[in-house]
């Protein structure tokens, strides 16, 4: 059973890395640029946006008309913002 969980962790982390790299190529480092411009509060705001979306999807069971983002996609984005925040703060040391 442990190997199954470990494999799923590897798969999720690999997917996260792929998505982050793909978006970084597509949009540039907009996350860091926005944080530089508006401060560290941006780090929390991005994460809070995803938490609010999860609340609507999981607790309130609201659907977003026209949006294709699933609960799983939202969790992946949340993890992505956490990773980007970590990198941003490390680079500011």
Identify the residue ranges that each predicted region occupies:
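Intrinsically disordered, low-complexity regulatory regions
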Residues: 1-93
């Amino acid at each position: 059973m442990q190997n199954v969980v470990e494999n799923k962790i590897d798969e999720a982390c690999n997917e996260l890395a792929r998505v982050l790299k793909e978006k970084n190529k597509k949009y540039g480092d907009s996350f860091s640029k926005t944080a530089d411009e508006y401060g560290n509060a941006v780090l929390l705001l991005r994460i809070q946006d995803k938490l609010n979306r999860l609340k609507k999807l999981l607790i309130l069971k609201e659907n977003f008309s026209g949006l294709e983002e699933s609960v799983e996609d939202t969790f992946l984005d949340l993890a992505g913002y956490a990773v980007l925040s970590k990198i941003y703060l490390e680079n500011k040391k």
